Regions:
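Bacterial Sec-dependent N-terminal signal peptides
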Residues: 1-24
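Short strand-turn-strand beta-turns centered on an Asx-Gly dipeptide
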Residues: 184-187, 693-696, 759, 775
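C-terminal tail/sorting-segment detector
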Residues: 771-782
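Beta-rich carbohydrate-recognition and catalytic domains
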Residues: 244-404, 408-453, 467-517, 537-589, ...
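Residue-level detector of functionally pivotal "anchor" positions at catalytic/ligand-binding pockets or at interdomain
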Residues: 258-260, 734-759
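Terminal processing/anchoring signals of secreted or surface-associated proteins
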Residues: 1, 463, 738-744, 760, ...
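Extracellular glycan-associated modules
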Residues: 24-51, 57-260, 265, 593-611, ...
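Beta-rich accessory regions
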Residues: 262, 494-519, 525-737
């Protein structure tokens, strides 16, 4: 884009009566490439700080770098010298790409939009300055103060909305002589107003706002009148450019797709951000839904707020992966914009029907929810087209809640189930595809029997055929006495499409006792490929909003689990085999009698895999991880009472479970191993999440937030003599395809002279730049 702006200089030459007239010099030029957190005006050479809670991020612009705005915390206040700005003729040109629109005021209907200032120094009280603004509905407007009548505020409203997910050029031209102020989008005039042939007024003491309105409008601790996306260039000219010149300038703007993903540098000093678990590059996520496979990749769609790590005006995010552990965020798939989904695009499902991929989602306006439909424009599932409403609201006789559609087919019939409640008990409606449309007569697919045990409303229903006539039905109920957790039934689909469980009482998806009050894996998405049934779900971090604000993100997904049904009708869960490809050459393998503690050095850090097989005797056995001189996390099994416990009570951490677990997650194993039998513990640690598998049968995921940089050591232990076979690896999500291990350490190694990064991975030498750990202490290399 910088080259386009160079062309602007040349094009700003006009011919009047055969005489070449050189346009005035630029009044300001901000190329938005930040250095040391500062941007520079190329005209005045003044520098301005980028206000940001996290490290300032440059990303690729159209030409050179653009500044990334996160939609809730970062903006610029620039004291540009308005004494050099013309009062009679002005052109403002901005190259930008919006990921989303500014957040609406969640306390009001969306008919009252929020505006964010893209660039301007407008003083509404004194009617001085100007501002180009973007609304929460995508509308653009130009406002400016004029000398008319001792100060008058003019507005030029745009008639077209700014398109998200692409580069745009927004241009404003103010021309006193022609008595017109015009607003352009990508070279097309979309709005104008008269300006009473009056001078533009400026307030010399008023700073320019970039990416935020001058006021602070918040939802909780998050700013909402802020811009989310990229700004590449801002140029102010003391010249009124013609419409032809503006159109020519804008002709090259959409030459490339913007990449909104935050660079890794944003989280370089984070101890908590997972590396091989699915999640967006920033902002807020919740339920992942609609896992599918297309064009050589797995795709997971999810609830996303790009404008900050908090829940509001939901979009459908999209991540993809070739291996289910190294993830890339794709552009937003579905965004609010139609009358029926203006308040949010909530959860639903992705399914293939006649080799066509489809999305069904919950569309929410200011008063109700409907089920809407969308189809992809490409095999990569990047761009989607909305197809309108598929099911027009909830049938009568149900609770007000009606959301989260899920598609399945049985006996040649196509069905959709939708979460709801009936008579105070959770249920799902059943909709059958007949004569080109979905029925909506209030039929119930399945309903619980007790609101306290089964919830009063069911979120995120899922139906998966598991073979041998058996179906797996999962839901995440609200209103349960135990708080939010995911439960499941196994049963059959009847000829009319309804469901009959094998047992009236459901089971918990997570090992019993570990998941309650919204902890653990929730609302799974399930996909079948190559004979495997793969499950993953959201694992909320349960942190206060202020902590999420400082982190820049909220929540992530579990590791993929392979599930099946045992002969006794229970669900079996084990880690997906392909996760082995992350194993590095830093590893340990030992088989011996163990009594006491044994270091697993050099395997240490925050991205590790621990695999232990214990011959059950007496006492306790298990693993220590995140160990330092002052504490540790402990996973243990007590052979005397069959208790499996994950204990964080001595771990220095940011507590996220007070009042629910208080650092101790315990349960009695459903099948207690007897003396002489084997107990298998398989643990994956990724910074702030642990995925734990027991005997390739039970699983659970837990969040923890260690605060000490020295918490990196690992051990295996037993309080009485036991035979143990243990393997451990450091993991690296950048690895792919190879599961070979080149070196096996059979003896504990001294790590005091070794160097590690913040993820706990061993470095061959001191890095030239960044944070590293040596001898248990933190250093910064510049």
């Amino acid at each position: 884009m910088k080259n386009v702006l160079k062309n602007l200089i040349a094009m700003a030459m006009t011919v009047v009566a055969g005489t070449t007239v050189i346009a005035q010099q630029k009044a300001a030029h901000l190329d938005m490439s930040a250095a040391n957190g500062m941007i520079t005006d190329k005209v005045s050479q003044l520098q301005f700080s980028v206000n940001s809670q996290l490290p300032v991020c440059n990303v690729n612009g159209l030409d050179g770098e653009a500044l990334r705005f996160d939609g809730y915390s970062n903006y610029v206040e620039a004291a540009l010298p308005v004494s050099s700005f013309s009062k009679s003729q002005l052109t403002i040109s901005i190259v930008l790409a919006a990921e989303t629109y500014p957040m609406m005021n969640v306390a009001e209907a969306e008919y009252a939009p929020t505006y964010a200032t893209i660039f301007g120094n407008l003083d509404e009280n004194t009617r001085e300055g100007f501002a180009i603004e973007l609304s929460s509905q995508g509308n653009l407007r130009l406002r400016f103060g004029s000398a008319y009548a001792n100060g008058f505020l003019f507005t030029a409203n745009g008639t077209k909305t700014l398109q998200c997910g692409r580069w745009n050029m927004v241009t404003a031209v103010l021309d006193k002589n022609s008595n017109k102020a015009s607003l352009y989008l990508n070279g097309e005039e979309i709005g104008s107003c008269k300006m009473s042939r009056s001078d533009i007024r400026y307030n010399a003491s008023k700073t320019f706002m970039i990416g935020k309105d001058e006021t602070d409008l918040k939802s909780g601790c998050f700013l909402i009148n802020t811009f989310c996306g990229l700004i590449d260039d801002i140029v102010v000219y003391n010249e009124s450019l013609t419409s032809d010149k503006i159109a020519q300038m804008a002709s090259n703007v959409n030459a490339a797709k913007p990449d909104f993903n935050y660079p890794a540098s944003r989280y370089a000093e984070s101890l908590w951000r997972p590396q091989f678990h699915g999640m967006p590059s920033g902002g807020w996520t919740n339920e992942c839904h609609g896992m599918t496979y297309s064009d050589g990749k797995y795709h997971v769609f999810f609830q996303k707020n790009a404008n900050g790590p908090y829940m509001a005006r939901l979009h459908w995010g999209h991540i993809s992966s070739e291996n289910l552990y190294k993830w890339t965020e794709e552009p937003i798939a579905i965004a609010p914009g139609e009358a029926y989904d203006i308040k949010g695009c909530w959860s639903g499902c992705v399914f293939d029907d006649n080799n066509i991929t489809n999305i069904l989602y919950t569309a929410v306006d200011n008063g109700r929810a409907v089920i809407a439909h969308a189809t992809p424009e490409d095999k990569g599932l990047v761009s989607w087209t909305k197809q309108g409403i598929a099911i027009n609201g909830r049938p009568s006789g149900l609770s007000d809640d009606f959301r989260d559609p899920y598609f399945f087919s049985a006996d040649g019939n196509k069905y959709v189930i939708v979460g709801t409640g009936k008579d105070g008990i959770g249920a799902c409606t059943l909709h059958k595809y007949e004569n080109g449309s979905w029925t909506n007569d209030g039929r119930i697919f399945f309903r619980g029997t007790n609101g306290n045990q089964h919830g009063t409303f069911w979120e995120m229903p899922n139906m998966t055929y598991m073979g041998n006539g058996k179906w797996l039905f999962t839901v995440t109920p609200l209103g349960m006495g135990s708080g939010v957790r995911t439960i499941y039934w196994i049963g059959k689909v009847n000829g009319d499409g309804t469901f009959t469980p094998d047992n009236d009482q459901p089971k918990t998806l997570e090992i019993n006792g570990i998941s309650k009050d919204g902890y653990g894996l929730l609302s799974p998405t399930i996909y079948q490929k190559d004979g495997k049934t793969i499950l993953l779900g959201i694992v909320p971090d349960k942190l206060p909003s202020e902590v999420n604000s400082s982190m820049g993100w909220a929540h992530n997904y579990s590791l993929p689990r392979e599930i099946s049904i045992a002969e006794n009708g229970e669900l079996i869960q084990k880690p997906l085999e392909s996760l082995k490809a992350m194993r590095t050459d830093v590893c340990v393998e030992k088989s011996q009698e163990l009594f006491g503690e044994m270091s697993l050095s050099p395997v240490c850090g925050r991205q590790i895999e621990l695999l232990g097989e214990f011959t059950v005797g007496s006492g306790e056995m298990g693993f220590h991880f995140f160990k330092s001189a002052n504490g540790k996390a402990t996973l243990s099994y007590n052979t005397n009472n069959g208790m499996l416990t994950l204990d964080f009570t001595t771990l220095a951490r940011r507590s996220n479970d007070g009042g629910s677990y208080n650092g101790v997650y315990s349960t009695v194993l459903p099948d207690k191993p007897m003396p002489g039998e084997k107990l298998k513990m398989h643990v994956f640690i990724d910074c702030s999440i642990a995925d734990i598998f027991i005997n390739d049968k039970w699983a659970y995921s837990v969040r923890m937030f260690p605060t000490n940089i020295e918490q990196i050591e690992t051990e295996v232990f037993a309080t009485s003599p036991v035979e143990v076979s243990v393997k451990a690896w450091t993991l690296d999500a950048e690895r792919s395809g190879s599961t070979s291990v080149k070196g096996i350490f059979t003896d504990a190694q001294d790590t005091q002279s070794q160097i590690f990064n913040l993820a706990g991975q061993q470095c061959p030498s001191i890095p030239q730049k960044g944070v590293f750990i040596k001898n248990g202490k933190k250093y910064v290399a510049n």
